[in-house]
């Protein structure tokens, strides 16, 4: 017996309308729909259920849309007249929440783009038309104002995020390189951009707190011997060759340490220049340590508990494409990037399945390491020999020396940095490591080469500094005799009772010391400039001219130049990364004696970004052995942290142990550079505060604080390792649980199938 169909009949009792006294109002009301028909049904009486009534026919799509449109119009007019009841408000609120949810998640739906756009427009239109109806009574305007401000604030935040993304320098260039060459090459340019930001902060500190105050408030050029070119060098002080070596006018300028005055305060603001010079130098070192460690900890935090390689290729197939891309060029870059990611993943998968001949691999790796040690020893001896020759040349007349003799040491270091990485790359072919492991070995070897070269250079520089200090003692004694003879001759030129003009000697005629601090700054600036020029010439000759030869001579050559020898060059990741780190180490080491070095390095990094991006896209080809770069560049940052530590040690030794020059620089006249701190405490602080600070600087207390910091670092490191291990264990448990659930579901499905087959 089938259930009876029932129907509920609803009668509506309309309210009476108020009569209008004006004929014009009646005409308007005839044109508009009646107000009563737009109001919600107020009085409803349910009739007796009639079981014999026929079932209503289903509505078609047009009728449903018309009824929905009428309901929305009624809601809108009811909102204007403040006559919507609570039931309709709740229903409207639920619909608005649903539409907002659609707006937020429409791009995640597996629909066609046309359907997404249509649904999005419809949802936005519904929200904009009916959002104001949620306000009731006197609070409706305030609610509408709050909703409007919320929309504007959300739009402002979205535009601000877009603005911040647009302000990231060279983002499009790096994305294009990543799509063509993979994440390994792009990681170098990301590292270069990060180094550019670090050097920008260092330049702002040195320029605003050292160079600019001296230029604005210090004594002008020619007022003191330290700010004047000697008389013997005036004729050639502005020559290009002299300026290229950073002598002449460049030496006696704000670019170098020796130009700065040793007065405690300068200018109308009583700016303490010596104190500022010392604190900015220490601040640059501290900031560099802080920013490197912060970047490393951030990358470790992003790394989480390790990569989850479950269903790696499935995720790449179904989730790699961005369906909101509308630019054809961006789409091409995205396509190339996805292709490169698949190549990297396939290489990673194959590398884990390779079977090796263990004994042959061990022999080849031993042979490669033997050749590496020979190369490192030979390069160290070559630099030592070049330093000895440079010391011999320093004792000769500069006019008798040629260009090579003057720049031999810098050129030898630059050439070793250019050719030794190529040899290490050839040795790495014997070892047959995974590409990522081979890159780390190569970086480590080049790092050892450059670090050894740098410390050989520093040891030679320390010998030169000691010679300058001994020379200063003789010059100081000679200046005392010169002053005594000048005063004696001046007094002898007048009689006993006569008066003459005041005694005056032009600053260019005053004898002066060698100023070893300026000499150190000049060496680092020359080394930086020569390294930049060597890098650019190498790119032009080794990449651009080689690419032109292969491209245009391939048609008339005996063999295929593109796939045979010489072919196009691959981008040397290891050499470029180590050159960048080595150059930054020289900046940290020399910026205390040459405040202009961070500015010079900014120009170098800025031009390198454009020049190397052009060279990569124009002259290089992707590597034959692709590999995925580490998600965190902590390997690069770790080497940078090590070079930072090793670069600041000689600087701190010079600050603490060596006496400053007596006639140049902001610390002249003091026994040690750090004495400027004690002078400031004595003159500018109360005695009790100076006493407290001296007690805090007690070596026993400092050693205790350092020990506590080491223990805290050890504890935090152990805690972090434990948390990472716990995360890995949880991931394993979740995988095992998922596998068990999968097996249980399979067994249940098999049991159901067997039961169904048994019933049949």
UniProtKB/Swiss-Prot annotation:
Residues 13-29, 50-61 have a biased composition (Acidic residues). Residues 30-39 have a biased composition (Basic and acidic residues). It catalyses: Ca(2+)(in) = Ca(2+)(out). One of its GO terms (molecular function) is voltage-gated calcium channel activity. Residues 221-271, 391-402, 470-515, 594-596, 658-700 are extracellular. One of its GO terms (biological process) is vestibular reflex. The keyword Transport applies. Forms the MET channel complosed of TMC dimer (TMC1 or TMC2), TMIE, TOMT, CIB (CIB2 or CIB3), LHFPL5 and PDH15. The interaction of TMC1 and TMC2 with TOMT is required for the transportation of TMC1/2 into the stereocilia of hair cells. Interacts (via N-terminus) with both isoforms CD1 and CD3 of PCDH15. Can form a heterodimer with TMC2, TMC5 or TMC7. This is Transmembrane channel-like protein 1. It comes from Homo sapiens.
């Amino acid at each position: 017996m089938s259930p009876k169909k029932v129907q509920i009949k609803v009668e509506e009792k309309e309210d009476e309308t108020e009569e209008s006294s004006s004929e014009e109002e009646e005409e308007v009301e005839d044109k508009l729909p009646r107000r009563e028909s737009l109001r919600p049904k107020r009085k409803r009486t349910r009739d007796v259920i009639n079981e014999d009534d026929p079932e209503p026919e289903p509505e078609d799509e047009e009728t449903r849309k018309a009824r929905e449109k009428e309901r929305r119009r009624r809601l809108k007019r009811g909102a204007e007249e403040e006559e919507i009841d609570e039931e309709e408000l709740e229903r409207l609120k639920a619909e608005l929440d649903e539409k907002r949810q659609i707006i937020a998640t429409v791009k995640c739906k597996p629909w066609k783009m046309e359907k997404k756009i249509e649904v999005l427009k419809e949802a936005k239109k519904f929200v904009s038309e009916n959002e104001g109806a949620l306000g009731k009574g006197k609070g409706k305007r305030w609610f509408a104002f709050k909703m409007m401000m919320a929309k504007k604030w959300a739009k402002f935040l979205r535009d601000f995020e877009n603005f911040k993304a647009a302000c990231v320098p060279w983002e499009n260039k790096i994305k294009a390189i990543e799509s063509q060459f993979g994440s390994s090459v792009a990681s170098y340019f990301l590292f270069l951009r990060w180094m550019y930001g670090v050097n920008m902060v260092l330049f702002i500190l040195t320029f605003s707190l050292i160079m600019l105050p001296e230029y604005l408030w210090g004594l002008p050029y020619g007022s003191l011997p330290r700010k004047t070119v000697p008389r013997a060098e005036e004729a050639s002080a502005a020559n290009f060759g002299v300026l290229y070596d950073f002598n002449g006018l460049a030496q006696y300028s704000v670019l170098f340490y020796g130009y700065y005055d040793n007065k405690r305060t300068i200018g109308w603001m009583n700016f303490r220049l010596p104190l500022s010079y010392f604190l900015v130098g220490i601040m640059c070192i501290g900031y560099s340590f802080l920013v490197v460690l912060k970047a490393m900890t951030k990358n470790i935090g992003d790394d989480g508990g390790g990569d989850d390689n479950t269903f790696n290729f499935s995720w790449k197939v179904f989730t790699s494409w961005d369906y909101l891309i509308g630019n054809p060029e961006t789409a091409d870059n995205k396509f190339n990037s996805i292709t490169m990611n698949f190549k990297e993943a396939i290489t990673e998968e194959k590398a884990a399945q390779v079977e090796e001949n263990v004994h042959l691999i061990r022999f080849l790796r031993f042979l490669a390491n033997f050749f590496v040690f020979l190369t490192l020893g030979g390069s160290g001896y070559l630099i030592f020999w070049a330093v000895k020759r440079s010391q011999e040349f320093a004792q000769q007349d500069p006019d008798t020396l040629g260009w090579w003799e003057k720049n031999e040491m810098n050129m030898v270091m630059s050439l070793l940095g250019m050719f030794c990485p190529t040899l290490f790359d050839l040795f790495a072919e014997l070892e047959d490591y995974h590409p990522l492991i081979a890159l780390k070995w190569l970086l480590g070897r080049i790092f050892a080469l450059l670090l050894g070269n740098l410390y050989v250079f520093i040891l030679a520089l320390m010998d030169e500094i000691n010679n300058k200090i001994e020379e200063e003692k003789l010059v100081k004694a000679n200046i005392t005799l010169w002053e005594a003879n000048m005063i004696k001759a001046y007094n002898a030129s007048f009689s006993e009772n006569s008066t003459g003009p005041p005694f005056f000697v032009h600053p260019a005629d005053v004898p002066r010391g060698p100023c070893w601090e300026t000499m150190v700054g000049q060496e680092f600036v020359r080394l930086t400039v020569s390294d930049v020029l060597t890098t650019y010439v190498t790119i032009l000759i080794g990449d651009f001219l080689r690419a032109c030869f292969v491209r245009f001579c391939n048609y008339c050559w005996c063999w295929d130049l593109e796939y045979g020898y010489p072919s196009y060059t691959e981008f040397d990741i290891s050499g470029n990364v180590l050159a960048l780190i080595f150059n930054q180490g020289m900046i940290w080491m020399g910026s205390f004696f040459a405040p202009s070095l961070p500015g010079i390095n900014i120009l170098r990094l800025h031009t390198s970004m454009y020049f190397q991006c052009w060279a990569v896209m124009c002259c290089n080809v992707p590597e034959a052995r692709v590999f995925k770069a580490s998600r965190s560049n902590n390997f690069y940052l770790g080497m940078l942290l090590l070079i930072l530590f090793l670069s600041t040690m000689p600087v701190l030794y010079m600050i603490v142990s060596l006496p400053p020059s007596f006639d140049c620089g902001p610390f002249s006249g003091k026994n040690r550079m750090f004495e400027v701190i004690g002078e400031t405490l004595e003159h500018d602080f109360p005695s009790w505060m100076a006493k407290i600070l001296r007690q805090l600087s007690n070596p026993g207390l400092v050693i205790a604080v350092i020990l506590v910091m080491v223990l805290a670092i050890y504890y935090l490191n152990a805690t972090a390792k434990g948390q990472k291990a716990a995360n890995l264990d949880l991931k394993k448990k979740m995988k095992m649980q998922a596998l068990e659930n999968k097996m249980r579901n399979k067994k249940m499905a098999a049991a159901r199938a067997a039961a169904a087959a048994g019933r049949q």
